[in-house]
Amino acid sequence: MTIQFGLHMMVGIISIEELSIFLRSLGKRECSVKKDHLGNFSDIEIIFPLELNTVHEMNSESEAEMGFNDSNCFRNMVLLVFAAVDVSAYFLRNGVFGLPKVILDKGWKQDIERTRRRRFMRCLIENHFHYDCVYRYC
């Protein structure tokens, strides 16, 4: 699963080194940073490791097997959303504007139909996650 941050950045507020240090502090993740033609950050993608990807391996019709009743799977997804919120808050404090969006990879799109993704989204919202950071799961 990839969290992609579309950013509009005030020039010179965050250096690439500061950004890299911060992202590394979130844990071991692949990260790619893109810049626009003016040299500002335009996209930041953080690819979470396999242990945070358990939902993708669930193909059964059983909701428990799809992870909705699996506390470990749900905890992992919660961690992912918290990471998105943390990164967004860090950028906002440093003059960067933009909300994180979660990119659902092929596993989500093929194996979990829309209604179940929406049910998962509602579950996150009911657990008091900020709506702006959750609705893009749909």
Curated annotation (Swiss-Prot):
<protein>
    <recommendedName>
        <fullName>Putative uncharacterized protein YOR333C</fullName>
    </recommendedName>
</protein>
